[in-house]
Amino acid sequence: MFFLKLHAKQFLLSTALIPSLALTTTVKVHAASNTEDAFDNAANTFFWDIMDSSPINLHYSFSFPEDYKPSDNPPLGSFSETFTETAEILNRAKENLSAVEYNSLTAKQKQVYKLMKHYIDINLEYCTLPDYTSTLGPMSGILSTLNTTITEYYLLSEQDIINYLDVLKDIPRFLNDVVKEIEHQESIGYVPSLYAFEQALENKDAMTTLENHPYLEAFESNVSETGLSDDVVNNYTKQVETVLNNEVLPAFSSFYETLESKKASASQSKGLAFYDHGQEYYELLVRDNTGTDMTPLELKDYLTDKLTQGLMNLSQSYSHNPNLLNDLDSLTAPKTDADAILQTLNQKAAECMPDIGDTTYTLSYLPEALQVPNNLAYYLSSPLDNESRNIIRINPSEVGDDSMVLWTTMAHEGYPGHLYQHQYFMQNSFEYNIETLIGSLGTSEGWAYYVEKLSLEWAGLDEATADAYFTNMILGMAALSVVDIGVNYEGWGIEETSNFLTTYYGELDKNTCQNFIDTCANDPGVYLPYSVGYYKTEDLFEQMADGYSSDKNMYAAYLKMGSMPFTLLEKYLIPDNSI
């Protein structure tokens, strides 16, 4: 299992690893002498087991891992051993936790204990179900993750370059594993759709041609941080070109030929509901992605209620201002440059959010081959020993030239979104390395969307316009999330999807409905952390408000909990709840 901790802002179809004050440990912990030590041992063993499972984890967790020797496992990990190895790691972690006397732990240890238990229990359940991983999913599939892993591979030393070459050389084996994974899924009846193959094949030319290859371009950009001489850099650049030409490009060519062959017999997208134990898998996916204990049908009702209320609010706004729709379309942000926007947002956040001091980041636009559909941007958090490495990448094909979209996206990924959220937690609450790997996506994305709404007033919008702008956006996300539940849990096709969407948006053509189905069926549950996360965050703050003297204090209490799932957050933060 390899972890690349991305926080990405997703976009609708047309109609976001970690710094540290001090490392918890850089060596494996030996036998514990008391309860608190037993817990420390359990937490750190779990973390290092994950590091061992795929050496690239070590690179993304530490900039300078001199005190730890990578395992002999392939750099990119192995699909063929993933479930077996994952189950072994999880069962070992569960056994270690069971030896801990919970009532004797510190308050912080109890929090991390519950976070670990939540993560372990859910992921052990995955191991009991068929493998319905969305291998070719355009947004969450392994190809987009692989490309990001390679292009974001930072280079701070000559040893990093040597390790990078090893990673490149591992790509042919890894792609072969991906094919084996697809064939395994085919053997259990879970066949990638025509849409999934088409999306995967779109980058064929870019990934099989050396000129302007994203891996080479990324290397040439990243290598500058090593401080090596031009001669040394040129020599390594030639080595990278050789490995790409002789090993990586042929491997991608063969991989894409296999996809082309399989595409010929592919069919239209259909949700998890059509597969054996698919509904059980989706129930688990919902709990995992949202951080709640709601069933899919409970979640559907919850989101439908939010949709109904939101549309009523919009209708009232339109009745007061018949030109509101045109006003929203013509909005412009006070800044139009991404870096200038981030600086402005940082200043605004400092006025009403808990202080995080000075922070740094690197901001850039993605090359065409890495521009994933429906994904506006992402934030890659910093290594445990290098808090200054905060990376934000923007997808220009999705952001376009809309300055308000860019403004809210920078609020989502930067200040006071993921970058700020991450930095505050690391400065004020972080103690265990494992915390950085097992948080809830629903919680982190919920915060990022919540502060998007706050940022609209910082852009100079009046309250009514800001509410209408944000409501219009989040309702689209909620509607797509309901479609996701319908497609993957209830087996919706075009007719059911059309009937639902028509209720809220008027009649839509067949192709538009099919686009929604394609998105939801090929990346199941991918939108749920955003819509559910936002609404649950809003609900949580409403319930917390009376217990805090100011919004700033309330935000501080929330942020100190990190990315703990809502099922736990509600017990810690809502008055009269106990844990």
Residue ranges of model-derived segments:
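Universal eukaryotic N-terminal targeting presequences
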Residues: 1-2, 24
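Bacterial N-terminal signal peptides that target proteins for export
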Residues: 2-15
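Bacterial N-terminal signal peptides
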Residues: 14-24
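Sec-dependent signal peptide cleavage junction
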Residues: 22-34
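N-terminal maturation segment of proteins
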Residues: 32-579
